[in-house]
Swiss-Prot record:
Pfam families (UniProt xref): Ribosomal_L32p
Signal peptide bounds: none
InterPro entries membership: Ribosomal_bL32 (IPR002677), Ribosomal_zn-bd (IPR011332)
Membrane as UniProt keyword: no
Keyword line: Ribonucleoprotein, Ribosomal protein
BP-aspect Gene Ontology terms: translation
Coiled coil: none
Official protein name in the record: Large ribosomal subunit protein bL32
Region of interest (Disordered), residue spans: 1-21
Annotated TM spans: none
């Protein structure tokens, strides 16, 4: 495992960590039972197979 050669200051650590940003998942249109729904791409197959409840909002 990599070990830092020198101690990193708190401000440097926090400014480095602040660069990590969460992104919203892109929604894809899927037609189930004649109705259009928007679901994340990773849930597309489950939505088509009826494994998830799409009417719950």
């Amino acid at each position: 495992m990599a070990v830092p050669k020198r101690r990193m200051s708190r401000s440097n650590t926090r400014s480095r960590r602040s660069q990590w940003k969460a992104t919203a998942t892109e929604l894809v249109n899927v037609t189930v039972g004649g109705q259009n729904h928007k679901v994340p791409r990773r849930l597309l197959k489950a939505a088509r197979l009826g494994l998830i409840d799409l009417d719950r909002r």
